[in-house]
Regions:
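Active-site microenvironments that recognize anionic phosphate/pyrophosphate groups
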Residues: 29-263
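Long, well-ordered alpha-helical scaffolding segments within enzyme catalytic domains
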Residues: 265-267
Length: 267
């Protein structure tokens, strides 16, 4: 008898099996994109000096915790490329898809991504220490460093500031600078409704109080997880120095009283 090799034919996949494979592949691709975004965010922290190599694993695990994830697979390459806004968008979208981020609106996305950025932030005491060490060298070096930190931390959102509209116009009183600030997000209807239903809180007492440092925020109060203040002493009283997150003008800074008292402008 003549010998033949019998090669079994591949059975055709059912529609459901085919769809399951597609879904599985998409899930793997989606997970890989999230891992790349996490790696990209850690890389961003390293590149900006927010963290050091010794902090990288800790920062990654903190990000995983905020994302509601309990595992991580190291992706190939340097991580997700692009600016900070693009990296955060991937993480925010995934958090909403998995139900970790309940509402997909600018108010709630801002509350959430501020938690992510805090994973890269030094403690307030470390910021204060580094500021005054630089101040001994040069006050300008100290304030330049602090301003950069305020931007790198995404407390000042560079990608929104550049959208602000600015121009000058001549008036009978002189040249007038006009700014339309687009970096301060408007509340969406859901956030407004949630703020009305929420229990009224008197903490922090205002958006400038010292107690804002590290505050997670809520629908009617911005997140300040990534906010750091430099304590200063003026006339034997405690004050705070910070930059404005909305930058109404170049290096817009604020000095405020350490106590919550009515503002009085006099001589």
């Amino acid at each position: 008898f003549e010998k033949f090799d019998i090669i079994p034919k591949k059975m055709p996949l059912s529609c459901q099996q085919g769809q399951d494979i597609i879904n599985s592949n998409e899930k793997m691709e989606g997970a890989d994109m999230v891992y790349k975004a996490i790696k990209g965010l850690v890389r961003y922290g390293l590149n900006t000096g927010l963290i050091t190599e010794e902090d990288a694993i800790y920062a990654r695990n903190q990000i995983l915790d905020v994302m509601g994830m309990d595992e991580y697979q190291e992706p190939e390459g340097e991580g997700l490329e692009g600016d900070l806004e693009a990296i955060l968008k991937v993480l925010l979208d995934h958090a909403h898809e998995t139900g970790v981020l309940k509402e997909d609106s600018v108010v709630y996305r801002d509350l959430f991504d501020t938690k992510l950025m805090n994973c890269l932030m030094p403690r307030p005491s470390e910021v204060e220490r580094d500021f005054w060490e630089l101040y001994k060298v040069s006050p300008e070096k100290a304030t330049d460093w602090y301003y950069k930190l305020s931007q790198d931390s995404d407390y000042i959102r560079r990608y929104r500031i550049v959208k602000d509209m600015k121009w000058t116009t001549d008036t009978r009183y002189g040249t007038l600078d006009i700014t339309v600030n687009l970096s301060k997000p408007e509340k969406d209807p859901k956030a407004i409704a949630a703020a009305k239903l929420a229990k009224q809180s008197g903490y922090p007492k205002c958006q400038l109080c010292m107690e804002n440092v590290g505050y997670a925020g809520r629908a009617d109060h911005p997140a300040r997880n990534n906010h750091r203040i430099i304590p200063v002493t003026i006339n034997d009283s405690q004050w705070g120095f910070q930059y404005s997150p909305y930058v109404y003008y170049n290096e817009h800074c604020i000095v405020f009283n350490g106590r919550h008292i009515p503002m009085k402008i006099d001589k």
